[in-house]
Amino acid sequence: MVNIRPDEISSIIRKQIEQYTQEVKVVNIGTVLQVGDGIARIYGLDKVMAGELLEFEDGTIGIALNLESDNVGAVLMGDGLTIQEGSSVKATGKIAQIPVSDGYLGRVVNALARPIDGKGDIASSEFRLIESPAPGIISRRSVYEPMQTGLIAIDAMIPIGRGQRELIIGDRQTGKTAVATDTILNQKGQNVICVYVAIGQKASSVAQVVNTFEERGAMDYTIVVAETANAPATLQYLAPYTGAALAEYFMYKGQHTLVVYDDLSKQAQAYRQMSLLLRRPPGREAYPGDVFYLHSRLLERAAKLGSQLGEGSMTALPIVETQAGDVSAYIPTNVISITDGQIFLSADLFNSGIRPAINVGISVSRVGSAAQIKAMKQVAGKLKLELAQFAELEAFSQFASDLDKATQNQLARGQRLRELLKQAQSAPLSVEQQVATIFTGVNGYLDVIEVSQVRSFLTQLREYIITNKPQFGEIIRSTKTFTDEAQTILKQAIQEHTEAFLLQQ
């Protein structure tokens, strides 16, 4: 029989009493008054912060947006079907944040940065707030490095720089997503991290984009953030900020990033739905009063950082859909005023076979030639002027029956330049190929080629230069200048190829 020693027992009890610490955990708790349509009204939660995450009994997460005198209006990040009136809600004390790491490259995630591609969890090293303040004036420097899209019409006439925000705007089915995805494909080997944010799109469309990226090897440097049309409005509203937070992680490490928001019209509609259900007063087109701030605080996060912050950059390509070409609607005018230029895609051009359907006349880049290499500046200056004169002449020539020879020549040149701007989807061109193509057009070397033959002639010319005159590309890549030597090589290549091409016909 074991002897019980009272002194041992008392010493154990004494030690435990000494180790006892009084712990009081303060939890901010409320009660659900009403729930439905992705919105919950909660009584209590006196100390809750605006934008704080809330946790419901069933594990659903919400965000406190309306702090009223007698209740709190919260939006739910799920369907909330199991939340009942009278169930308790706990304030978490956290503002919405996401994990970030290099492991996100090549993955498809949702607005909470959780993987949805079935490839397992993503290891993360740190967290970033979904809503971070934009870099200040002192932290930035002016945009000066080109962000090549691989599309001649843009790189020559509406150049985009690293750290710029360029709006892509047009009706549905005019190729807006194609311009953005081609730009991402063209960043291969350029050491640029790309983030593609799909907001309220069909799941099939997102799958198609991801497949294109995978086939072309673009997923190695791309993150896709997707919230499809069946996702709760809250998540569609958050998705662009998640994309920006992921890009910021790389930007502050001194890397160059490109973010595509496809598209912000759907985000504004999701925000309008949330605001109206929260009973916030509606404004123009029933959007809430702060819809401008919704987009400005997102797009201001795109920047070219100064040397003290590592020279990183975030370039934003927001996409906005117009109805019947109406650029003066509320959301289009808002985003046009926030961005540094817009690329306008026209349904008429698209239907007449001009693709990409970029309306060069009303598209602008407010950064301009600062975002071009010298070689491109040297050849592209003439292109925009010639196309503008051609558009004007074409309008007049519809009424005139007999045109003089000079006018006929200018119209013929313009038709060939328009052909020169046409490109197949997912076939971006390198800078040296673009320089060669533009030089051929603006200097009249295409005038002897039939209009219908221009595209095949240029495709073959680019292949001919790569195989027979590789030194041309080397000069442009190394010096970034269209030197006399490069010009001589190019003229020789054009002459040789033209002779061979005309003999084939």
Curated annotation (Swiss-Prot):
Main location: plastid
One term of GO molecular function: ATP binding
Membrane-topology annotation of the record: Peripheral membrane protein
Annotated localization: Plastid, Chloroplast thylakoid membrane
GO cellular component: chloroplast thylakoid membrane; proton-transporting ATP synthase complex
Keyword hit for Nucleotide-binding: yes
Keyword Transcription: no
Keywords: ATP synthesis, ATP-binding, CF(1), Chloroplast, Hydrogen ion transport, Ion transport, Membrane, Nucleotide-binding, Plastid, Thylakoid, Translocase, Transport
EC number(s) on file: 7.1.2.2
Disulfide-linked positions: none
Residues flagged as site, Required for activity: S363
Catalytic activity: ATP + H2O + 4 H(+)(in) = ADP + phosphate + 5 H(+)(out)
InterPro entries: ATP_synth_asu-like_sf, ATP_synth_asu_C, ATP_synth_asu_C_sf, ATP_synth_F1_a_nt-bd_dom, ATP_synth_F1_asu, ATPase_a/bsu_AS, ATPase_F1/V1/A1_a/bsu_N, ATPase_F1/V1/A1_a/bsu_N_sf
Residues reported to bind ATP: G170, D171, R172, Q173, T174, G175, K176, T177
Residue spans crossing the bilayer: none
SUBUNIT field: F-type ATPases have 2 components, CF(1) - the catalytic core - and CF(0) - the membrane proton channel. CF(1) has five subunits: alpha(3), beta(3), gamma(1), delta(1), epsilon(1). CF(0) has four main subunits: a, b, b' and c.
Family: Belongs to the ATPase alpha/beta chains family.
Function in brief: Produces ATP from ADP in the presence of a proton gradient across the membrane. The alpha chain is a regulatory subunit.
Identification of the protein by name: ATP synthase subunit alpha, chloroplastic
Species assigned in the record: Zygnema circumcarinatum
Source species taxonomy: Eukaryota, Viridiplantae, Streptophyta, Zygnematophyceae, Zygnematophycidae
